[in-house]
């Protein structure tokens, strides 16, 4: 039986109301919660192979963040492991159904490897949907990684459940993903 996966990218406090938060990020939280609730998935690593899956990623940095390549280019401490900013937004946490995948970089090779293994050993994935933050950094990075790891699986990004650093960069990222054969749904027409 074909399966669908919902990947919830970095719906963490620091990206919503914390050090890198935006009004656009705050606005999508109820939509993301609604999407998760309507998806009906179970825990990523232990669910029945015929069930739909919801996977969560966590942007995760250590105390030496400002010394990293990313930190030198974005010198704003955020998502330091164990802090309030690293935690999922409370409404998203309340509907979380799986163990988050920590990622110290924009894209998660670990997420791609887990989904490729599921696709290979448990039967083909029908579709991978992505939602979350930030469209123009981590959502696009994970979408492109997944496209490279699973080129024959349909990838969809729900634009109404994503927000970028700015509305303009959000829109540019959606256009870039469309150009890479990633379907964008619920987006404004450009």
What are these regions (language model features)?
Residues 30-33, 37, 116, 140, ...:
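Amphipathic, non-transmembrane alpha-helical secondary structure
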Residues 1-100, 152-156, 165-186:
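Active-site acidic carboxylates
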Residues 128-141, 147-150, 156-167:
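Phosphate/ribose-phosphate-bearing ligand recognition and processing surfaces
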Residues 18-20, 104, 133, 160:
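Short strand-loop junctions, especially beta-strand C-caps/beta-turns
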């Amino acid at each position: 039986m074909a399966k669908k996966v919902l990947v919830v990218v970095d719906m963490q406090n620091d990206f919503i109301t914390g050090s890198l938060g935006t009004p656009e990020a705050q606005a999508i939280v109820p939509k993301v919660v609604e999407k998760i609730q309507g998806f009906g998935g179970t825990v990523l690593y232990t669910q029945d192979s015929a069930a739909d899956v919801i996977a969560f990623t966590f942007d995760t940095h250590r105390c030496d963040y400002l010394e990293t390549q990313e930190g030198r280019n974005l010198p704003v401490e955020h998502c330091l492991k164990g802090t309030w900013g690293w935690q999922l937004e409370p409404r998203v946490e309340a509907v979380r159904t799986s163990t988050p995948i920590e990622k110290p970089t924009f894209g998660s090779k670990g997420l791609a490897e887990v989904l490729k293994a599921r696709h290979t050993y448990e039967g083909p994935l029908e579709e991978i949907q992505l939602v979350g933050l930030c469209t123009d950094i981590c959502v696009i990075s994970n979408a492109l990684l997944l496209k490279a790891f699973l080129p024959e699986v349909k990838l969809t990004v729900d634009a109404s459940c994503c927000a970028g650093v700015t509305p303009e960069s959000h829109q540019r990222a959606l256009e870039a993903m469309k150009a890479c054969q990633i379907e964008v749904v619920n987006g404004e027409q450009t």
